[in-house]
Amino acid sequence: MQEVDQKVRSSIMINYSYLALGDSYTIGEQVLPEDNFPYQTVALLNKKEPDSYHFTAPQIIAQTGWTTDELDAAINAAAISKQYDIVSLLIGVNNQYRGRPVNNFKIEFEYLLQRAIQFSGNKPTHVFVLSIPDWGVTPFAEGRDRKQVADEIDAYNSVCQKSAAAFKTHFINITTSQREDGNKQEFLAPDGLHPSGKEYEKWAIELADAIIKAL
């Protein structure tokens, strides 16, 4: 009887796919692949409802140093031909780091967001924008104008939040919590700039909870 029940559960289990778009914060610079936030999110989701659905390994299009236009070019090169059940977008820190104007970022970010919506099968409620972390609180920023960095990150995140609302997608603020822990060793990768798996776990918990509500 137990074997029959397992077969029934398997027949109704839904397989979900997840596309993660971004930069170093998505690929997980200096952490193991399973410790980046997309992989941790999938692991959490598969633990929460193991008999109801299963997320396959996330497809990640992200690389350290990418700006919005570089991510867009990489998406073109990937020639994505399928749709995904969930799409996340976290991009912009390198635009800020290179001193690019916020107005230009808004144009390129909203274009990427529209592409993300298309990849979700035109389901904006299945698209999740994550806020840009503040690298100014990390040891890497020693000797730099931390307030200026914070102000610029806030301006970029304002664009992300308003654009997410305008296109009816989700916005997840991970920056506030990251600013609290961003100078603590256990929340940092060895380079003193990028997050550790422990920091990514916090993001994954928030994202997984939001995804469950959206499904």
Describe the residue ranges of each PLM region.
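Serine-esterase "nucleophile elbow" of acetyl-processing enzymes
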Residues: 2-64, 74-81
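Short acidic active-site motifs
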Residues: 70
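Alpha-helical cap/lid subdomain in secreted, periplasmic
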Residues: 73-215
